[in-house]
């Protein structure tokens, strides 16, 4: 809407000013200083630290994570998440333009994605307290694949775009709560920032590939059809990848409190 009304430069300036507010607001986010509690017992009745009582180092945690099959599967699945979100977020307006839809349809679609993302993320976090988080992740990825198939095979109209955007919005960042929770359950919270950051790094590599590959294939074929099918295949692959992931905390390997 800002671009349509004021052109791209004022719209970008408005977003930049909004981003500048993040810095001052962040100063209010302070953790209360408190004494670290004793190590809590793991599921196997031992303390979540090394057997000699020494907390595991960042290097040792990193080495263990990369030797952990379930952690690697989770990381691979998150690559797919980034691929899909970046492809749709960046290239959906161009795809709709190719179908002769008004630019406002694209902006409305992106707004709907943002709106329904709120509800989807909250729902995923709430459900994660009741059922297995890896099942939630598999469901999210599978539903993305189904939604994209329906979108590709139905006529592209403002209504179909709105329904697709709302559906994808509900599935957008709903992967975040269960993914971070699985990392914490598998490897503890002592080095969660680092280990969760590596999983998110995979997400960002997927984002790059989604944007770059879609542009390259569009230039080569004049269509986004190939990229849609790549995203669909990846969706079901990610759904399958997350099914065998085990969420158990590794025995006697983590200090639960930083």
Model-based region annotation:
Residues 173, 186-221, 231:
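A late C-terminal transmembrane helix in Major Facilitator Superfamily
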Residues 22-31, 230-258:
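Multi-pass alpha-helical transporter architecture, strongest
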Residues 63-126:
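Extracytoplasmic gate region of multi-pass secondary transporters
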Residues 1-35:
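Helix-loop-helix hairpin linking two adjacent transmembrane segments in secondary transporters
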Residues 30-60, 251-257:
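Flexible cytoplasmic inter-helical loops of multi-pass small-molecule transporters
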Residues 87, 105, 111-117, 121-182:
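C-terminal transmembrane helical hairpin of 12-TM major facilitator-type secondary transporters
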Residues 1-6, 96-97, 127-128, 213-222:
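Interfacial helix-cap and linker-helix signal at transmembrane-aqueous boundaries
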Residues 18-22, 143-148, 168, 234-238:
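MFS 12-TM fold signature
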